[in-house]
């Protein structure tokens, strides 16, 4: 068979785009290029896992670094640097006691935070803080943010602290530590996984059971539907409104304000489902990151259900070290508020994230004050639960609006439109103009009624299906995703953090 020069050139261009970093189209979990790479990776991984654990770990580390490169370019050098520094210091820390042990912990945590702050907050500190306070005009070249740095930095810190406190006292080799810190399913946006959850299974080198394989496939399907089908579609209208709120009616602005919380939930939980599913296929259990968060009846409950791995991280490594609830009620309220303020800043270098964190901190304090200090709570009846849910959901949606915008000016225009240009008469025309968007929002909100037991039953029923039926459902799911998402694939929102 003869191939033309054009065909060979096109094939080479396709291969180049698959293996070389493309700034205009970074590799994303859930994309077709990632699926092709993962199938190729999985075949070799399965062989190496049976042959040599060391070879398997080296292979996964190399693939993880390649994945980081495809997402972020050469900025991925920060990842192996962080791994080597943290491993060397924590290994030295194991050999010491007392002040020397504490000094080494302090050193490695400060190094981790210094690197995080340099890449993530330098432009913010110089541009938004220093220039505003001192009326200066300093400017810096834009500093490229290593994708996932907030997540793998927190994993590195948790490992160091748990080693210092001997909560995790298992001997770990350099390869095992690099595997833990670079493991690609959780590299870009978590879940933030503790060493005790991952390294023991890595040492056992167990193959994935058939139940894990099918659970992984189920979660990948669920994540694809959430992210590629629903979130990306909902995002199109939301982005139009948030980019130019003055060109839309008050009703449309309000729709976008309520649409964004649905979008970010589908986006982030969809990514988490896919990453947990990929890890399960590789033989590793990762912790759940979402547990029906929009069913919460208080802000306190919301943070037990939303981004669970981050909530627990801040609880264990910020809130409790600050004193938690052990130093009086006033200090407890202050610790809650400060922890959420830091959590807001963790999300990004913007005053909007600080405000978002402050709103959640305020919500936590108010709920704890009324329920614990005053003993006032809404009765746990159907009507009472409905009222608690409505208050909580509206407050969380209000806080999300600050999370989405770049400055208060945009948000002011949106709420001004809602206040002065809102009419229920827009409801029917809006539905006729955007029926699919409206049905997506209604459908997702109705899914809030879905109980945990029903979800686990659905997952169990999928696992019990014949393997042919499972693969057929997966193929149908892929076809639906390709048909719906082929026009516009949105980057994961949490990639920027």
Regions found by a protein language model. Name each.
Residues 2-496:
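Membrane-embedded transmembrane alpha-helical bundles that form the catalytic cores
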């Amino acid at each position: 068979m003869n191939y033309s020069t054009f065909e060979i050139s096109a094939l080479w261009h396709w291969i180049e785009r698959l293996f070389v970093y493309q700034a205009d189209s970074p590799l994303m979990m859930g994309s077709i290029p990632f699926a092709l790479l993962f199938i190729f990776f999985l075949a070799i991984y399965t062989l190496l896992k049976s042959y040599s654990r060391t070879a398997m770990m080296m292979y996964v580390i190399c693939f993880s670094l390649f994945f980081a490169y495809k997402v972020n370019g050469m900025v991925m050098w920060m990842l192996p640097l962080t791994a080597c520094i943290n491993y060397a210091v924590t290994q030295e820390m194991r050999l010491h006691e007392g002040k020397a042990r504490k000094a080494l912990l302090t050193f490695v945590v400060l190094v981790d935070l210094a690197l995080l702050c340099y890449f993530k907050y330098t432009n913010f500190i110089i541009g938004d803080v220093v220039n505003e306070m001192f009326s200066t005009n300093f400017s810096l070249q834009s500093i490229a943010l290593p994708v996932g740095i907030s997540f793998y930095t927190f994993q590195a810190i948790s490992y160091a602290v748990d080693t210092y406190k001997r909560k995790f006292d298992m001997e770990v080799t350099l390869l095992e530590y690099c595997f833990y810190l670079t493991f690609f399913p959780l590299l870009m946006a978590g879940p933030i996984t503790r060493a005790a959850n991952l390294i023991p299974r890595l040492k056992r080198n167990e193959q994935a059971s058939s139940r894990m394989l099918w659970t992984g496939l189920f979660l990948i399907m669920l994540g694809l539907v959430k992210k590629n089908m629903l979130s990306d579609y909902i995002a199109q209208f939301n982005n139009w409104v948030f980019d130019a709120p003055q060109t839309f009616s008050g009703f449309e602005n309000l729709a976008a304000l309520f649409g964004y919380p649905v979008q970010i939930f589908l986006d982030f939980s969809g990514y988490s489902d896919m990453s947990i599913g990929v890890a399960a296929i590789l033989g590793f259990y990762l912790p759940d990151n979402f547990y029906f968060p929009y069913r919460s009846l208080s802000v306190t409950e919301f943070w037990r259900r939303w981004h669970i791995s981050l909530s627990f991280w801040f609880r264990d490594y910020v809130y409790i070290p600050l004193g938690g609830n052990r130093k009086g009620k006033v200090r407890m309220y202050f610790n809650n508020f400060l922890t959420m303020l830091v959590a807001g800043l963790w999300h990004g270098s913007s005053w909007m994230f600080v405000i978002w964190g402050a709103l959640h901190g305020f919500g936590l304090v108010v709920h704890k004050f009324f329920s614990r200090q005053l003993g006032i709570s809404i009765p746990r009846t159907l009507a009472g639960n409905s009222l608690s849910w409505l208050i909580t959901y509206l407050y969380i949606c209000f806080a999300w609006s600050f999370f989405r915008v770049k400055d208060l000016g945009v948000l002011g225009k949106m709420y001004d439109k809602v206040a002065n240009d809102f009419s229920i008469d827009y409801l029917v025309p809006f539905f006729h103009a955007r029926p699919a968007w409206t049905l997506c929002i209604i459908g997702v909100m109705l899914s809030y009624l879905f109980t945990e037991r029903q979800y686990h039953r659905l997952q169990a029923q999928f696992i019990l299906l014949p393997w042919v039926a499972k693969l057929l459902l997966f193929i149908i799911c892929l076809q639906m995703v390709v048909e719906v998402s082929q026009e516009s694939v949105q980057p994961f929102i949490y990639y920027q953090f």
